[in-house]
UniProtKB/Swiss-Prot annotation:
A motif (Bipartite nuclear localization signal) lies at residues 2-19. It is found in: Nucleus. Substrate binds at K203, S204, V205, F206, D207, R218, N374, L375, Q376, N439. The keyword Protease does not apply. It comes from Ailuropoda melanoleuca (Giant panda). GO terms for molecular function: mRNA (nucleoside-2'-O-)-methyltransferase activity; nucleic acid binding. Its main location: nucleus. S-adenosyl-L-methionine-dependent methyltransferase that mediates mRNA cap1 2'-O-ribose methylation to the 5'-cap structure of mRNAs. Methylates the ribose of the first nucleotide of a m(7)GpppG-capped mRNA and small nuclear RNA (snRNA) to produce m(7)GpppRm (cap1). Displays a preference for cap0 transcripts. Cap1 modification is linked to higher levels of translation. May be involved in the interferon response pathway. S-adenosyl-L-methionine binds at N234, C277, A278, G279, P280, G281, G282, F283, D335, I336. Residues 37-54 have a biased composition (Polar residues). It catalyses: a 5'-end (N(7)-methyl 5'-triphosphoguanosine)-ribonucleoside in mRNA + S-adenosyl-L-methionine = a 5'-end (N(7)-methyl 5'-triphosphoguanosine)-(2'-O-methyl-ribonucleoside) in mRNA + S-adenosyl-L-homocysteine + H(+). The modification N6-acetyllysine is found at K108. This is Cap-specific mRNA (nucleoside-2'-O-)-methyltransferase 1.
Length: 835
């Protein structure tokens, strides 16, 4: 037996180690870091030794056969003409060692595989080996010549309509009922046939593709995808932000024909808007974020999973938005296709906008058409009509309308657009960059509702009734405007065709791009982040994350809102008005007065029903208000909680209401430095914004009626003796407010609104009031800035005339106590010193 360390035994082991070392050298030489020349050189240098090692292992001497084999292996390694030359020398030599010859398979009889194993074409989570018939073919669309992504957008309006608004007689035979049609391929009146078929074909290609795979490719392909929803509820909010900017803020800052704003933050009128078919409410969240408490929204959408999600309004105060679901109010179903819902919503909006209507209406209706994407226009025709009808029902004269549409190929859709074209000053079809380019979505934007559109509204109302009657039948309304009428307006028709064809071309390229991005997962849009920043900057949207508002305790929020103001001010009590202090109300023109119904308190709103009150004493705590009401966060008011009464006798109803005496901070807006009259005006505006007429179960919020002191007599006219429940049938003094509710008055607050050293007087020669500075002796009719008494001056200097026992302010009361200040004394003093 040979030992392990015998020379003959160890020789093969040494040779094997030598071959491993040579192989390592070759691997090093063939690494990707070396240039091709060094790899080839290393391969040449090692070929002979590799062949020799193999021959020694096999126990063969160098002969002609082994030389030929080595030569062939060498040729395989070095052959640049070989289709295998792309592989490094080591892999080629290993194949040569196994007897590989180009064009032949491995094995004794060359029976092995001759072709290289293809790289995997696996796409995402598809089944292994699955190919999607019809999708993997080429679309033959060059999408690479699309315009460079940009934040700048152009608007193209329809020409101004010169045709008169059609009347009832003219439209009497316009509606055409025909056989229900469920094909779109032949709708070529307002789009070229080739383009129409191309876009439908491109859409159909995606029918077999998995939704997730499509969405991933779309996300990478869309240069505007990263804009998303920023800090808003959803992407819809950013669409509205996008279009509001493009259309020169015509929604959040509407202007008249001269360019002057129709509503101003400092003035009393709110910006009224409506949002229909709009759950969960992204459009409204944007408007309320932009306008804050200077806007009031009304909403109607289908109840259910896609209802308004007001609790998710993180960036705006949902207390300024009032959902109303048509017939039945808050208990309705919100179905806009039901005529009774349209009528109920119209009446509700008009009742709460002084019969004027809203400044603008937004509509973003849509529903799932999965599996029938090409028929979306036909399936949603009634929804589109009802949204247009709602605009003509609730938008005020001069107001605006924006509504989502889809494809507009059919004469039915074109007819609806034509009616808007007749009823508004200007109309356009617009696709914002925040709307994904591959979908059929775009918006019809209408500016300036004309006078005299009632007949068109009534006509569309009748068409909707007919559509409801034809449900589940083979018939349908196919036309709302005759084709010859539409085509008779050449400018309108040309615009429709141009818009449709331009939109089709955009869609085709976008769909082809997504198709390419599905097939090649390495493709991506490099400028998404850059475009996002540019758009947000241009639209005035802060680049912030969406986070829920932080909660706070009332005391901390109070100190945050008053911003270092001396807290002792809030503990001041009013000076009692008596015979001794009557002189304090001179000059009379400097003062205003309000009827009191209970103790004054400070009220803070932290959002929704998180409302607390405090009596002003530092030793006392903020107490949760036990009333059913809602206020926007960051609100601080001076109020009374008053028990209001309606009716008399057994039918008398009692309700607790919040009466505002003065305002400090409104939804984060500090108004303490403004004039008292301005603060009261803003308070009334604020109350309109937060009031919920659809919710009679909620406790009301009202602003105290303010009287000029020289007109105090008007207050006594509103006083009467009434029997109040629980008063043993004894009539009590009652004050009746503007809303026909009455309460038991406790006295009169008298507030000075002019700051020292200024005072007010009346010019007999000019018949008007003026301001006079007691120090400088300057007189002026204009309001001097330093004459405005801020909140703390008004609060500190107020007086209170208590109407307790012995004070006779109504003829039916007990006789006046001669030791107390009488009504006659006060009125006489006012009359004497107001002349």
């Amino acid at each position: 037996m040979r030992r392990r360390n015998d020379p003959e035994c160890t020789a093969p082991i040494k040779k094997q180690k030598k071959r491993v070392a040579e192989l390592a050298l070759n691997l090093s030489a063939a690494s990707g870091d070396e240039p091709p020349s060094s790899v080839n050189h290393a391969a040449k240098a090692s070929t002979t030794s590799l062949s020799g090692s193999d021959s020694e292992t096999e126990g063969k001497q160098h002969g002609s056969d082994s030389f030929d084999d080595a030569f062939k292996a060498d040729s395989l390694v070095e052959g640049t003409s070989s289709r295998y030359s792309m592989y490094n020398s080591v892999s080629q030599k290993l194949m040569a060692k196994m007897g590989f010859r180009e064009g032949e398979g491995l094995g004794k009889y060359s029976q092995g595989r001759k072709d290289i194993v293809e790289a995997s074409n696996q796409k995402g989570r598809r089944g292994l080996g699955l190919t999607l018939q019809g999708f993997d073919q080429e679309l033959n669309v060059d999408w690479r010549d699309e315009p460079e992504p940009s934040a700048c957008e152009q608007v193209s309006w329809f020409p101004e309509c010169t045709t008169e608004i059609p009347d009832t007689q003219e439209m009497s035979d316009w509606m055409v009922v025909g056989k229900r049609k469920m094909v779109i391929e032949d709708e070529t009146e307002f789009c070229g046939e080739e383009l129409l078929h191309s876009v439908l074909q491109c859409k159909s290609v995606f029918d077999v593709l998995d939704g997730d795979e499509m969405r991933r490719a779309r996300t990478r392909a869309n240069p505007y995808e990263m804009i998303r929803g920023v800090f808003f509820l959803n992407r819809a909010a950013m669409k509205m932000a996008n279009m509001d900017f493009v259309f020169d803020r015509m929604f959040t800052n509407p202007r008249d024909s001269c360019g002057k704003p129709l509503v101003k933050d400092r003035e009393a009128e709110l910006l009224y808007f409506a949002d229909v078919c709009a759950g969960p409410g992204g459009f409204s969240e944007y408007v309320l974020w932009r306008k804050k408490w200077h806007a009031k929204g009304f909403g109607m959408t289908l109840k259910g999973p896609n209802d308004f999600k007001l609790e998710d309004f993180y960036s705006a105060s949902s207390e300024l938005f009032e959902p109303y679901y048509g017939e039945g109010g808050i208990d309705g179903d919100g179905d806009i296709t039901r005529p009774e819902n349209i009528t109920a919503f119209r009446n509700f909006v008009l009742d709460n906008t002084d019969r004027k209507g809203v400044h603008f209406l937004m509509a973003d209706g849509g529903f799932s058409v999965e599996g029938q994407e090409n028929l979306q226009e036909i399936l949603s025709k009634q929804l589109l009509l009802c949204q247009f009808l709602m605009a003509l029902s609730v938008v005020r004269t001069g107001g605006h309308f924006i509504c989502k549409t889809f494809d507009l190929f059919t004469p039915f859709s074109a007819g609806l657009i034509y009616l808007l074209y007749c009823c508004f000053e200007r109309v356009c079809l617009f696709k914002p960059i925040t709307s994904r380019p591959a979908n059929s979505e775009r918006y019809v934007v209408c500016k300036g509702l004309k006078v005299g559109i009632d007949d068109v509204r009534d006509y569309l109302f009748a068409v909707n009734i007919k559509l409801n009657q034809l449900h589940n039948t083979d018939s349908d309304v196919s036309l709302v405007v005759p084709l010859e009428v539409i085509k008779g307006d050449h400018e309108f028709t040309d615009y429709m065709i141009r818009s449709n064809e331009s939109h089709c071309s955009l869609q085709i390229k976008a769909l082809a791009k997504i198709h390419a991005f599905v097939q090649d997962t390495t493709l991506s849009e490099p400028r998404q982040a850059e475009i996002r920043k540019e758009c947000l900057r241009l639209w005035g949207i802060p680049d912030q994350a969406r986070v829920a508002p932080s909660s706070s305790d009332p005391k901390s929020k109070f100190f945050e809102l008053i911003q270092g103001t001396e807290i002792d001010i809030f503990s001041y009590k009013p000076t009692l008005l008596t015979s001794k202090t009557l002189e304090k109300i001179r000059p009379v023109l400097d003062y205003r007065c309000m009827v009191s119904g209970s103790e004054q308190k400070f009220l803070i709103g932290l959002g929704k029903s998180q409302i607390y009150t405090w009596d002003g004493r530092q030793s006392d705590r903020w107490v949760k208000l036990d009333l059913k009401t809602e206020l926007p966060r960051d609100t601080l008011l001076s109020v009374e909680i008053v028990h209001e009464l309606k009716g008399e006798g057994k039918a008398q109803r009692k309700i607790s209401a919040i009466h505002i005496l003065d305002v400090l901070v409104l939804n984060g807006s500090d108004v303490r430095e403004q004039h008292f009259n301005q603060r009261i005006q803003l308070a009334e505006k604020f109350v309109k914004a937060v009031s919920k007429p659809s919710r009679p179960d909620m406790n009301p919020i009202r602003v105290k009626e303010v009287y000029r002191l020289e007109e105090m007599e008007k207050i006594f006219v509103r006083l009467e003796m009434k029997i109040i429940k629980g008063s043993s049938g004894t009539p009590k003094l009652s004050y009746t407010g503007r809303d026909d509710r009455h309460f038991v008055p406790t006295g009169l607050y008298i507030v000075r609104t002019v700051n020292e050293p200024w005072t007010m007087g009346f010019s007999k020669s000019f018949k008007r009031k003026f301001f006079y500075n007691k120090k400088t002796k300057i007189s002026t009719f204009d309001l001097p800035a330093d004459s405005i008494a801020p909140f703390h001056i008004c609060y500190y200097g107020r007086l209170f005339w208590e109407w307790g026992d012995g004070i006779r302010v109504h003829d039916s009361q007990k006789p006046q106590d001669p030791d107390k200040l009488s009504k006659e004394d006060v009125l006489s003093f006012i009359q004497t010193h107001s002349a």
